[in-house]
Amino acid sequence: MVKAVTVLNSSEGVTGTVYFTQEGDGPTTVTGNLSGLKPGLHGFHVHALGDTTNGCMSTGPHFNPVGKEHGAPGDENRHAGDLGNITVGEDGTAAINIVDKQIPLTGPHSIIGRAVVVHSDPDDLGRGGHELSKSTGNAGGRVACGIIGLQG
């Protein structure tokens, strides 16, 4: 089993830890908890770069190794990094539990060294009709991020 972790922090007070596990060539399981977010839905994505030299802005676009349009996690046509939305409760916390086949921890399309980004607004899953729907899901600004690293 391969394990990875990212610790998310932001100047806006968002904190949390997200864990990734993958058994063999199976899907990757994503679990964790975040706090300090406004209640509601927030876009949750793997971005292409593990670069935070300019905060979350330098993490690049959504991880998209095969050049597809933005979509929902269950769509065939989606960026690999499109993990949909997380739901934040009235207390500002979110529990994450995602199983996804397009974010492996090994191989040529591994997400190790890339970034997880939490956005300020809901991801419209490519269906919002906004000019940004097919590229970012119109999910708004980047409120927290962290680099995905291997875990022992």
Swiss-Prot record:
Enzyme Commission identifier(s) = 1.15.1.1
What would be one Gene Ontology cellular-component term for the protein? endoplasmic reticulum
Q: Detail the disulphide connectivity of this chain as listed in its UniProt entry.
A: C56-C145
Question: Which cofactor(s) are needed, names only?
Answer: Cu cation; Zn(2+)
Q: Which residues bind Zn(2+)?
A: H62, H70, H79, D82
User: Which reaction does this enzyme catalyse, per its entry?
Assistant: 2 superoxide + 2 H(+) = H2O2 + O2
**Activity regulation description:** Inhibited by KCN and H(2)O(2).
Instruction: Please give the Gene3D superfamilies that the UniProt record associates with this protein.
Output: Superoxide dismutase, copper/zinc binding domain (2.60.40.200)
Where expressed (tissue)?
A: Expressed in fruits, leaves and pollen grains.
- Keyword Glycoprotein assigned to the entry: answer is yes
The answer to whether the entry has keyword Secreted is no
Alphabetized, the UniProt keywords read:
Allergen, Antioxidant, Copper, Cytoplasm, Disulfide bond, Endoplasmic reticulum, Glycoprotein, Metal-binding, Oxidoreductase, Zinc
Q: Name one GO molecular function term.
A: copper ion binding
Q: Which PANTHER family match?
A: SUPEROXIDE DISMUTASE CU-ZN -RELATED
The similarity annotation says: Belongs to the Cu-Zn superoxide dismutase family.
Question: Which protein is depicted?
Answer: Superoxide dismutase [Cu-Zn] 2
Gene source species: Olea europaea
Q: Which gene produces this protein?
A: OLE5
